[in-house]
Amino acid sequence: IRCFITPDITSKDCPNGHVCYTKTWCDGFCSSRGKRVDLGCAATCPTVRTGVDIQCCSTDDCDPFPTRKRP
């Protein structure tokens, strides 16, 4: 499987059986810059914590950098 990986946001090969993930959360600059984003691959979908959104998928390049709606 190929997943986008941060910080470069490039598509890279991940080991067999892994899933791609997109993790987003707010930090102190969330209101002006939007949510922080972490893209990668893992053996299993990371555990969700309070205030953190995680989406996992299992097809090539299924975790693109999320777009932010402009006002």
UniProtKB/Swiss-Prot annotation:
Its main location: secreted. One of its GO terms (cellular component) is extracellular region. Keywords: Acetylcholine receptor inhibiting toxin, Disulfide bond, Ion channel impairing toxin, Neurotoxin, Postsynaptic neurotoxin, Secreted, Toxin. Expressed by the venom gland. Belongs to the three-finger toxin family. Long-chain subfamily. Type II alpha-neurotoxin sub-subfamily. CDD domains: TFP_snake_toxin. Signal peptide: none annotated. Binds with high affinity to muscular (alpha-1/CHRNA1) and neuronal (alpha-7/CHRNA7) nicotinic acetylcholine receptor (nAChR) and inhibits acetylcholine from binding to the receptor, thereby impairing neuromuscular and neuronal transmission. One of its GO terms (molecular function) is toxin activity. This is Long neurotoxin 2. It comes from Naja naja. It holds the Pfam family Toxin_cobra-type. It is found in: Secreted. Disulfide bonds join 3-20, 14-41, 26-30, 45-56, 57-62.
